[in-house]
A protein has these predicted regions:
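Short, low-complexity N-terminal intrinsically disordered segments enriched in polar/charged residues
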Residues: 1-24, 28-32, 121
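Short, hydrophobic secondary-structure boundary micro-motifs
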Residues: 27, 38-39, 66-68
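Short beta-edge strand/loop motif at the mouth of beta-sheet-based domains
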Residues: 42-53
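Short, charge- and proline-biased low-complexity linear segments
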Residues: 28-36, 53, 110
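Short, charged low-complexity linear motifs
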Residues: 1-4, 15, 23-24, 37-41, ...
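A short gly/proline-enriched turn/hairpin at secondary-structure junctions
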Residues: 35-44, 113
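A beta-strand edge to alpha-helix "cap/lid" segment located at domain peripheries
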Residues: 52-121
């Protein structure tokens, strides 16, 4: 069963990977057969190799954002995280993440929703 510490550790590792864009940091987040949905209606990117390649093709600079977040809830192996991302260029986004965890604390599935905040560039 997933707990708040597992979610916190994963989100911290996600932010590390977001800033570093290092293969090993990204790979550490997902199971070998994990799925990443960059939007709720997107086809999943399946498998850690494909996740790493897709992530790197969309990579942002390490100092482009500030990020705050909180856990909205946990149900079994499923966690719900609310985030706020502020880009240095003035773009502001609200996020909802749905993360299904494997027993080892990696994500077997990750879906993100991101919505531009009113007043954002």
């Amino acid at each position: 069963m997933t707990d708040t510490a597992t979610v916190s550790n994963w989100v911290t590792a996600y932010r590390t990977a977001w800033g570093s864009n290092l293969d090993a940091d990204i790979r550490a987040l997902f199971t070998d057969d994990g799925d990443y949905l960059f939007g709720p209606s997107d086809e999943p990117v399946h498998g850690v190799d494909a996740i790493v390649a897709t992530w790197l093709s969309r990579a942002e600079g390490p100092d482009d954002t500030t990020f705050s977040w909180n856990v909205l809830g946990i149900d079994g192996d499923l966690a719900f995280v609310q985030g706020k991302v502020d880009y240095t260029d003035g773009q502001l986004f609200d996020n909802l993440w749905v993360i299904r965890f494997a027993p080892d604390g990696r994500a077997s599935s990750f879906t993100e929703w991101w919505m531009k905040r009113p007043g954002s560039k």
